[in-house]
């Protein structure tokens, strides 16, 4: 009975471990790569950048409100 339980609890594990990288990048190399990525992102077009930096909010009044309806006036402004 004990041998049956021990067979169930046995798992097949690989005997070999995954190899570590030979030479991981140093802190300075990592910081340099991050700086290059940021500089590459800054070279995108200003219109594309402005669309993310300044979101545009539009207010639509409720249809049953008595202010500006019919005509449904909308108010549009950008954040600073």
From Swiss-Prot:
Domain of life: Eukaryota
Composition-biased stretches (Basic residues): 57-67
Biased segments, Basic and acidic residues type: 1-14
Ranges for region Disordered: 1-80
Name this polypeptide is given: Uncharacterized protein YDR461C-A
Species whose genome carries this gene: Saccharomyces cerevisiae (strain ATCC 204508 / S288c) (Baker's yeast)
């Amino acid at each position: 009975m004990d041998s049956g339980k021990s067979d169930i609890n046995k798992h097949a594990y690989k005997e070999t471990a995954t190899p570590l990288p030979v030479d991981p990048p140093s802190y300075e190399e990592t910081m340099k790569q991050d700086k290059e990525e940021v500089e590459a992102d800054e070279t995108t077009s200003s219109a594309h950048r402005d669309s993310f930096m300044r979101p545009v909010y539009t207010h639509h009044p409720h249809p049953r409100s008595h202010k500006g309806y019919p005509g449904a006036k909308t108010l549009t402004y950008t954040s600073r």
